[in-house]
Amino acid sequence: MASGRDPREERPGGLEIWDLSREPWDEWLRDMVEEINNEAKLHFGRELLYQVWNYCQEEGERQGRPIAERAYKYYRLVQKALFVHFRCGCRRRQPFEPYEERRNGQGGGRPGRVPPGLD
């Protein structure tokens, strides 16, 4: 410590670590939500993903949060669900079929809001 400097390295800022300045946050988030939806619809089915999306949107509206923050919450929830699903041992060999979503011939209607990548 002869030079008077702290020998520990300084912590880099968030943008230095992730370098998000090169791509707008909204565009990055939209791409990530579409990618995770492409994987999630093979394992969970669209109806469940619609319900999670609508939950995030309605909860965010109640709390006055921006749309990007609501989409990020959806992304985190689906990512955690996929992690647990794979951790428990996914045995699915085929993509999720629409008829599997309907129990005893009863299926829900399509909700008003659809997450990106599930159109």
Curated annotation (Swiss-Prot):
Q: Name one GO cellular component term.
A: host cell nucleus
Q: Which GO terms describe its biological process?
A: symbiont-mediated suppression of host innate immune response; viral life cycle
Q: Which domain of life is it from?
A: Viruses
Q: Per the record, which residues fall in region Disordered?
A: 98-119
Location in the cell reads: Virion; Host nucleus
Q: Which residues form the signal peptide?
A: none
Which keywords are on file for this protein? Host nucleus, Host-virus interaction, Inhibition of host innate immune response by virus, Viral immunoevasion, Virion
Subunit composition and interactions:
Interacts with the P6 region of unprocessed GAG. Interacts with host VPRBP/DCAF1, leading to change substrate specificity of the CUL4A-DDB1 E3 ligase complex.
- Physiological role: Plays a role in nuclear translocation of the viral pre-integration complex (PIC), thus is required for the virus to infect non-dividing cells. Targets specific host proteins for degradation by the 26S proteasome. Acts by associating with the cellular CUL4A-DDB1 E3 ligase complex through direct interaction with host VPRPB/DCAF-1. This change in the E3 ligase substrate specificity results in the degradation of host SAMHD1. In turn, SAMHD1 depletion allows viral replication in host myeloid cells by preventing SAMHD1-mediated hydrolysis of intracellular dNTPs necessary for reverse transcription.
Which family is annotated?
A: Belongs to the lentivirus VPX protein family.
Misc. remarks from the entry: The 155 isolate is from a monkey imported from Kenya.
User: What's this protein's name?
Assistant: Protein Vpx
Give me the gene this protein comes from. vpx
